[in-house]
């Protein structure tokens, strides 16, 4: 009976394949990879956005401000420009949030000053007076090299969401910081750009909130492998014949 490869082994094999393709001088890397990812982020935002339950279907298309999508692209440009940074700290997190909030009514980069309940996860966020300490914990765990990179990346994503440091755009900030961390450690980012992710993403977060780290991690691994395979497919098409 053939043994099914571990998801982490598949990820490492895909990572090696991507690096080998990118090292090939005959590949038009400028036309793919980071540029394609930037385009897909707008699709991801539309898919993952959790509309208010009361909102009629016909109004949903107008609800998502296109400045939000533009800002997401600008935040991605910032990450690509600083993809080789040695340390991502709390200032970096606030900086990304500031970019996401440009031309909106959300105070960019400012920690919330009121209590928060994460209704979608069924948990209370920490007291706003604890925010500096909670975000220091996020930064500490991000730097803890005793923990494997992928585990740290997934923890960063969830911990920022669970802390709810800002008045809004916490999940977007968490995804971008996770991907920045992955890129700075030699991986490609994770995209949640399939229609099934609208429900599956929140199911995974709820599982993690209930202590089920296995289900959460399996979903994150699966999305990473899916993204890697899409990148490999597109990179191979970019070769000069």
Functional labels for PLM-detected ranges:
Residues 1-241:
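FIC/Doc superfamily catalytic core
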């Amino acid at each position: 009976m053939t043994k099914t490869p571990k998801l982490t082994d598949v990820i490492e094999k895909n990572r090696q394949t991507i690096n080998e393709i990118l090292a090939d001088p005959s590949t038009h890397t400028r036309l793919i990879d980071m540029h394609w990812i930037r385009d897909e982020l707008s699709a991801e935002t539309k898919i993952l956005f959790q509309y208010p339950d009361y909102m009629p279907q016909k109004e949903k298309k107008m609800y998502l401000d296109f400045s939000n999508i533009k800002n997401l692209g600008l935040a991605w440009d910032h990450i690509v420009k600083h993809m080789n940074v040695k340390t991502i700290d709390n200032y970096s997190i606030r900086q990304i949030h500031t970019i996401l909030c440009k031309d909106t009514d959300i105070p960019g980069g400012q920690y919330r000053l009121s209590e928060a309940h994460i209704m979608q996860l069924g948990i209370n966020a920490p007291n706003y007076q604890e925010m500096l300490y909670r975000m220091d914990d996020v930064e500490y765990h991000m730097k803890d090299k005793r923990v494997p990179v992928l585990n740290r990346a997934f923890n960063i994503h969830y911990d920022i969401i669970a802390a709810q440091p800002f008045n809004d755009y916490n999940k977007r900030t968490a995804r971008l910081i996770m991907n920045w961390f992955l890129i700075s450690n030699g991986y490609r980012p994770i995209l949640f750009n399939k229609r099934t992710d609208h429900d599956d993403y929140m199911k995974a977060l709820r599982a993690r909130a209930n202590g089920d780290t296995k289900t959460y991690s399996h979903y994150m691994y699966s999305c990473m492998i899916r993204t890697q395979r899409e990148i490999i497919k597109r990179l191979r098409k970019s070769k000069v014949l």
